[in-house]
Amino acid sequence: MRGIGRYHAPVDGHAALDRAIRKRIDFPKKGILYYDITGVLMNAAVFRYCLDQMVEFYRDEHVTAVAAIESRGFIFAAPFADRMGIPLILVRKAGKLPGDTYSCSYSLEYGKATVEVHKSDVVAGARVLLTDDLIATGGTLNAARTMLRAGGAEVVGFFAVVGLPFLRYHELIGDLPVRTLIEYNQETSN
């Protein structure tokens, strides 16, 4: 039922998206500027703008599955999969999936992390779009791509609402096409 929550029609999708993303200084630790997408989720029109742009970007790309990186990637990938009529593959933190999985560890600025995907969900020859809310260094994306390729899938691109190119994600992910809706080119709240 429309109108129960806060519904604001953005005048300009890009500007409304920027306003909806909350910039939090010193979170989760001192010196980090955190881009909080919960404001996007609180504004139905801005959320719809994100999904509409995603569909527009990939409508003619012959994507046959979308893989979502835990957990905020799920938020954008699930409705995209529904709109496109394609399966949703979950890329989860280690130990969250039962059964046989592909697994890949990668380095973070503060340690290591491991992600997994069900082997049965990765179909050889599938054209997979990887999705997350934000791309920073590209470490999680690269690990997910490694697992999908191990199962014979072709990763055709990566979509994120927010891109942080100053963290040089292109160095790690190389030739993978990246599309973002908004980019921030420095770590400041201005």
From Swiss-Prot:
Subcellular location: Cytoplasm
Superkingdom of origin: Bacteria
Keywords for the protein's UniProt record, in alphabetical order: Cytoplasm, Glycosyltransferase, Purine salvage, Transferase
Cellular component aspect of the GO annotation: cytoplasm
First-level EC class: transferase
Keyword Nucleotide-binding carried by entry: no
Catalytic activity: AMP + diphosphate = 5-phospho-alpha-D-ribose 1-diphosphate + adenine
Signal peptide interval: none
Example GO molecular function: adenine phosphoribosyltransferase activity
EC numbers on record: 2.4.2.7
Pathway assigned in UniProt: Purine metabolism; AMP biosynthesis via salvage pathway; AMP from adenine: step 1/1
GO biological process, one term: purine ribonucleoside salvage
Coiled coil start-end: none
Function noted in UniProt: Catalyzes a salvage reaction resulting in the formation of AMP, that is energically less costly than de novo synthesis.
UniProt similarity note: Belongs to the purine/pyrimidine phosphoribosyltransferase family.
Subunit details: Homodimer.
Name of the protein in its database record: Adenine phosphoribosyltransferase
Species, as recorded: Treponema pallidum (strain Nichols)
Lineage: Bacteria, Pseudomonadati, Spirochaetota, Spirochaetia, Spirochaetales
